[in-house]
Amino acid sequence: MVAFVRQTVFLGALVGMGLLSLPLQAEPKLQTETASAPDAFPIRFSYYPALAEKNTDGLDNAGVVILLHGDKGSRINWDKGASTAAGQPTFPAVLQEQGYAVVTVDLRKHGQSVLEGREDPIQNDDYAKMAAGDLKAVKDFLQKEHQEKKLNMGKMAIVGAGFSAPVATAFAEYDWLQKPHDDSPVPAMRTPRGQDVKAIILLSPDAAAGRLQTNKSLVFLNKQNLAFLFFVGKQDGADKGAAKNCFKACAGGTKKAEGRVELLEPDMKDRGTDLLGKAPPLIEIPMLKFLDTHLKKITVPWVDRRSRLDR
């Protein structure tokens, strides 16, 4: 009953703020996909395609949001939402209703992204493979959808939780380091191969995972003027200042970061994806407003991602 009330308040608030329209579809449209990372590791993910009826300006203007799970979690943390009342929409479903394409990922050695018949322990180098391999496979899939004008990969956001925070930021850093195709004498006219991630949300971010360091990537990404939203529960004893350090790494609190970098500290003890479903006005609604401002409403023209030399 409590969960139902929370979700009813959540939906009412979304409609009241113009972030959601009624009626909602009964079930979200989604499909399960498998992609191969560069090392052939199988990566399973759920794909919620952008809906034409929610994108009156065309699907080629639809942003895409990648959702990552936390430690010992899986994409089910997003797809099912343990604290969601029966019959009420999950966070990915709400994003889809808002017009986004959404991907929830099982990072390697989590959920269904495992080698058949094996239960391999996670090694230190796995985290870098998640960032540069698993998420590259997901992005390659999204590029195919982009080329068919089913979304605009130039309007991409990623959400990390716990250990997947450094994975998310490392992926975004790799993305921004991709140089455009050398297919025009005019640099501004060259076809992009990256620099697609425009916004990042981190829930209870870990400072590091293997050799990945969250703040190292954030310092670089902040120079690209990305938008950042950090969450940490005030009663989270495991945080040890990591979220505030992320905020500081992005020059949070300065005039340059005003309106672009934000840290929210709800009075909660939960961590990572466990923050979801407990107090939507403190977690989900700020996330949706952030994405609305820094992803949905930004102008990024759709661009053919093939090199001009191959068209």
Residue ranges and their predicted role:
Residues 92-116:
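Conserved alpha/beta-hydrolase
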Residues 119-149:
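Alpha/beta-hydrolase active-site loop
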Residues 255-311:
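C-terminal catalytic histidine-bearing segment of alpha/beta-hydrolase fold enzymes
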Residues 26-59:
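N-terminal cap/lid segment of alpha/beta-hydrolase-fold proteins
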Residues 76-84, 107-130:
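Cap/lid segment of the alpha/beta-hydrolase catalytic domain
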Residues 52-97:
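Short, surface-exposed "cap/lid" segments of acyl-processing enzymes
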Residues 149-162:
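Alpha/beta-hydrolase fold nucleophile elbow
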Residues 182-258:
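The feature captures the conserved acid-bearing segment of alpha/beta-hydrolase catalytic domains
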